[in-house]
Amino acid sequence: GLGDVYKRQMPNSEQLLVKYPTSSSREKVMGWVLSQQAWIQKKRQKSLGKEDTNRAFFEKLFSEHEIVLLDVKRKVRVSSVRKESGVFDDEVVLWIKDANISREQFLEVLVKTIKKWALKALQEEFELKLAQMGPFRYPYRKFFLTSAKTRWGSCSSRGHVRIHWNTVFVTKSERDYLYTHEAAHLTEMNHSPRFWQLVEVHCPGYKRARTILHSRTLGFL
């Protein structure tokens, strides 16, 4: 039935892609689409907002050679010396030997450089939050970076915590909420009222930070 239909707005386009069972008539499908106009418009506006945010990020990166990581603005420069590369207090140095590198290759090097630094940087922030919140029901054992498509983080009963590497681009309040959320799972493995009470105790006003975090695009870089 039409419950199996899903809709996906085409990026940078006014088109709408609708997939539906072959047993459904065109008239029935069009009627269903018309009944979903409010939902479609809401999703379209949200998509356009994300595109504007992403566009601003890349314009800043390529025109001013600047990037903000963990709330700190840093200049981005290129070096042909490998040992000079890395993320530092006021700059990001990329090891690039070929001056004619493509934009896509440049971004690949940027991502690789940031990820290498982000593992330790995000782990240190997360473990600082842990120290403020403990003790927990389940022991914390290991920290991982993730590139998941839909989730900012996760925590298992084995004590494995995963945080999306894109977290380096969000604000301190958003990171505090994310760390609190995943750390709270070391005591409450579900999203029960007790879980959210625990989150609120350690991250007052978390709802605003959660809303902003989930309005962002995961994996845009």
List each language-model region with its residue ranges.
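Active-site-proximal or metal-binding-adjacent scaffold patches in catalytic folds
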Residues: D4-Y177, L186-L221
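Walker B catalytic acidic pair
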Residues: E182
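Glycine-rich phosphate-binding loop
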Residues: G1
